[in-house]
Amino acid sequence: MSLPPIRLPSPYGSDRLVQLAARLRPALCDTLITVGSQEFPAHSLVLAGVSQQLGRRGQWALGEGISPSTFAQLLNFVYGESVELQPGELRPLQEAARALGVQSLEEACWRARGDRAKKPDPGLKKHQEEPEKPSRNPERELGDPGEKQKPEQVSRTGGREQEMLHKHSPPRGRPEMAGATQEAQQEQTRSKEKRLQAPVGQRGADGKHGVLTWLRENPGGSEESLRKLPGPLPPAGSLQTSVTPRPSWAEAPWLVGGQPALWSILLMPPRYGIPFYHSTPTTGAWQEVWREQRIPLSLNAPKGLWSQNQLASSSPTPGSLPQGPAQLSPGEMEESDQGHTGALATCAGHEDKAGCPPRPHPPPAPPARSRPYACSVCGKRFSLKHQMETHYRVHTGEKPFSCSLCPQRSRDFSAMTKHLRTHGAAPYRCSLCGAGCPSLASMQAHMRGHSPSQLPPGWTIRSTFLYSSSRPSRPSTSPCCPSSSTT
């Protein structure tokens, strides 16, 4: 008789952020996790809420030890979905949750295994009642510890993982729960600490490699090495690792160019890791991992094209300044473009010396605005002629604008406008209804609303001015002629 499926409810289903991320997925995903031959897009903000190990952005991979189907179940649990498992899938999921630091899923698996131990399969009841059996718990014969078992105590020595299972029956009268006694909880805590302190990449007791995660976050693009372990590492073919994170606009089909991540839209900073799109791309590493996917040259502008432009403007001697990127040989351009060894392309004329280090130069200052008009008295320069004429009145003392409401006189129109505000009036006032207007155009539009028969004889638009101007007509020769030289 087959066992019923096990249902693990997720405690994250009520989180509004997780609900939003689950609806948007795979949109706005800033993490791409490779498990075996499958890729799983995810949001680093959601993963960081359940595990520090998973809360990293970028392209990274899991080694042997976790199957794609098991990781898909773990990811569904993290995104707030209830997971239904077959009896044989519970233990691999619990081991994956323990290895990746998803404590809530590991505890849910412990509770599910404890409930199953309380309700054994009726088909195995006959085996439980046989007196010659040393144990009355069928789960112990199946290799699946029940609720009466203590948690696993894992100790790693010399690259080997030894599992010691200590079982005992709790005192009668206490409810049967996972880790019922305080001693069992302490042992479980110690075993977790040992697992966290154990180096990554060692072999387990069954000879298989544990979960191995390679991350690439160094901005320089140089290859980052794992810890040096006494035991051998898995073969290179068993890992789908990326040396550098791929940019979202080049490799992720569910992301569009310039689309921000989920955490940036929600205005919440990430908890762990650094933005993977800030890392410097390394074309050589991409070609090594994804041989059939060629990255356009335009994506390498922060490394290749920028280096060429900076090298063209950082020559140590005046005679060796190249004319542009075309002066570099094809081999030098390729080396500067890839940048896998960190060496820079040499400047033209210095092939036998080390490459010139590219240094950012400040942008050139914009050209000064031409000021052809100069005052004949003080030499102050102006770009417009009327500015020079207004300034010249400072030397002559001329104040051609006079207020119609008081004896105040001003040197220019803007000063007269400010003065009229002290009277609470606009520069223009209708002579029929007394309405004020801030500009001559608005006064002309206002006067069109009056009938021409209402206007007094000899009326002109100047009748609405609250100021008068006594500026003389412009002479043929201005007292402040523009200088012949603009220097």
From Swiss-Prot:
It comes from the Eukaryota. One of its GO terms (biological process) is regulation of immune system process. Predominantly expressed in testis. Some isoforms are ubiquitously expressed. One of its GO terms (cellular component) is nucleoplasm. It is found in: Nucleus. Keywords: DNA-binding, Metal-binding, Nucleus, Repeat, Repressor, Transcription, Transcription regulation, Zinc, Zinc-finger. The keyword Zinc-finger applies. Residues 112-244, 308-371, 468-487 are annotated as: Disordered. This is Zinc finger and BTB domain-containing protein 32. It comes from Homo sapiens.
